[in-house]
């Protein structure tokens, strides 16, 4: 049994309840014990960062400090959360002043501080492939997927250090996982492109065109469904796919799931 501090991210318990409904039994089946980060807060979603970088860093320092109290490394099912947490850890380790400033706020408001010297953060995908092993995943399959699946990574965790042992430039962990589940991964050119979720309210049409490109590319490549490693980006791919298709004048009609 491997143990992790579980960070749900911004939407797993809001607009994407299916993530919470599936991650708990999945982890139990595969021997991953989740210890919730009690009292966790939003990581800022790279939206707060646009107006106040220090505030977003402090929000992440608080989550890190709470996870350190649990005594376990962090796991999340959201690529955005993984990328943001990793970036915060990297910033704090390279910039002691940034860490000191965040800890000053935390000490005054919460009575806690973050150390950041040992803790790590991982996406569930990387834990399944790197630590649990795809053989164990395959052995646990009851109903093989048997579908043509387009994998959407999102850009946040596709950077050195944030993507586990995967290739940051040409990732393939999701494709390997899909094959272990009995599905057929479909290659398409925009699988690591951004859909612009943090700019959804400020750059609406541009974001819709970015979203439409991903959906249309996946559909043209023959995918029956698109699976997102990012719960935040999933809202674009699912809830906004009709609008994205109209704005970009492209066929975007494809089921999108987390």
Residues covered by each model-derived region:
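Iron-sulfur cluster-binding electron-transfer modules in prokaryotic oxidoreductases
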Residues: 1-258
């Amino acid at each position: 049994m491997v143990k992790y501090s579980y960070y749900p991210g911004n939407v797993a318990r809001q607009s994407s309840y299916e993530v919470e409904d599936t991650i708990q039994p999945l982890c139990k089946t595969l021997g991953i014990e989740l210890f919730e980060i009690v009292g966790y807060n939003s990581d800022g979603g790279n939206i707060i960062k646009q107006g106040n970088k220090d505030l977003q860093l402090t929000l992440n320092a608080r989550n890190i400090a709470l996870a350190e109290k649990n005594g376990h490394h962090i796991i999340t099912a959201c690529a955005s959360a993984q990328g943001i947490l990793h970036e915060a850890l990297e910033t704090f380790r390279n910039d002691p002043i940034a860490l000191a400033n965040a800890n000053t706020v935390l000490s005054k408001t919460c009575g806690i501080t973050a150390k950041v010297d040992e803790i790590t953060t991982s996406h569930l995908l990387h834990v399944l492939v790197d630590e649990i092993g795809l053989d164990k995943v395959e052995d646990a399959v009851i109903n093989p997927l048997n579908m043509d699946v387009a994998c959407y990574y999102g850009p946040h965790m596709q950077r050195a250090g944030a993507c586990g042992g995967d290739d940051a430039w040409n990732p393939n962990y999701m494709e390997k996982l899909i094959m272990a589940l009995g599905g057929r991964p479909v290659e398409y050119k925009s699988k690591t492109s951004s859909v612009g979720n943090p700019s959804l309210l400020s750059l609406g049409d541009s974001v819709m065109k970015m979203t439409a490109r991903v959906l249309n590319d996946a559909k043209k490549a023959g995918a029956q469904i698109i699976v997102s490693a990012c719960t935040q980006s999933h809202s674009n791919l699912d809830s906004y796919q009709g609008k994205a298709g109209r704005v970009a004048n492209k066929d975007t009609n494809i089921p999108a799931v987390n």
